[in-house]
């Protein structure tokens, strides 16, 4: 959807690469961005780690990543240290930290649910680990062993609604309380094909008391 239907809709060139080709040699991905002057490309967080770990200094010297405006990072937890390592490794190739685009989405929502502003710096929050384990969001004054840095996934798309709900009580969470991410909007699928029971449980959640909904239960935690 994001990398095939969108270019067709916009009438712009799109270069495709198989996941196998990337995994065999991560350099191929950045080489393609450099060769074709790509402006938008991305992948899961681990893809950026692979590039840092596998691409040699000699290979880096041949790259020009200055055209890369949106480096989307999603499909799994986005890690602050990965972004910092990648930026440091490829800054001399023209890569800019503000190109990183942490985002959140899933197939059931026709891809994207939230994302940051283009060219905006990723938003980081340093939080207390012990509080997170208790589903509470408490800021840590500085980075240390008992803290954890989380990367924000931007703002909800205008046509979508996100609520954070307690998965046990089905009630809205309080501010600064971790809960399950629920999504509602026109891009949310109607359900799973020929799976009525699973569709009812996943796509038709309602908040207790308010009866607001129907929401898609993502199974992911957020605040």
Go through the PLM ranges and name each one.
Residues 1-39, 50, 54-58, 161:
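Conserved AMP-binding/adenylation subdomain of ANL enzymes
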Residues 3, 28-32, 46-54, 81-89, ...:
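Alpha-helical scaffold elements adjacent to nucleotide-binding pockets in ATP/GTP-utilizing enzyme cores
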Residues 10-12, 38-42, 54-147, 161-163, ...:
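Gly/Ser/Thr-rich phosphate-binding loop
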Residues 16-22, 36-41, 72-79, 151-153, ...:
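Hydrophobic alpha-helical scaffolding
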Residues 150-163, 167-176, 180-223:
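Conserved ATP-binding/catalytic segment of the ANL
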């Amino acid at each position: 959807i994001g990398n095939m239907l969108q270019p067709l809709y916009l009438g712009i060139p799109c270069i495709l690469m198989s996941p196998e080709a990337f995994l065999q040699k991560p350099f191929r991905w950045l080489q393609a961005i450099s060769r074709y002057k790509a402006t938008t490309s991305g992948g899961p967080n681990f893809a950026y780690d692979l590039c840092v770990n596998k691409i040699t200094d000699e290979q880096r010297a041949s790259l020009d990543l200055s055209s890369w405006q949106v480096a989307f990072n999603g499909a799994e937890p986005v890690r602050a240290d990965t972004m910092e390592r990648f930026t440091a490794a490829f800054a001399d190739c023209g890569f800019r930290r503000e190109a990183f685009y942490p985002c959140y989405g899933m197939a059931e929502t026709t891809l994207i649910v939230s994302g940051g502003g283009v060219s905006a710096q990723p938003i980081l929050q340093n939080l207390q680990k012990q509080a997170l384990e208790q589903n509470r969001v408490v800021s840590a004054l500085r980075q240390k062993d008992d803290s954890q840095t989380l990367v924000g996934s931007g703002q909800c798309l205008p046509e979508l609604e996100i609520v954070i709900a307690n998965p046990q009580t089905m009630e809205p969470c309080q501010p600064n309380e971790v809960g399950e991410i629920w999504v509602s909007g026109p891009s949310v699928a109607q359900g799973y094909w020929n799976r009525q029971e699973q569709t009812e449980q996943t796509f038709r959640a309602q908040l207790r008391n308010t009866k607001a909904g129907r929401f898609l239960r993502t199974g992911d935690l957020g605040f």
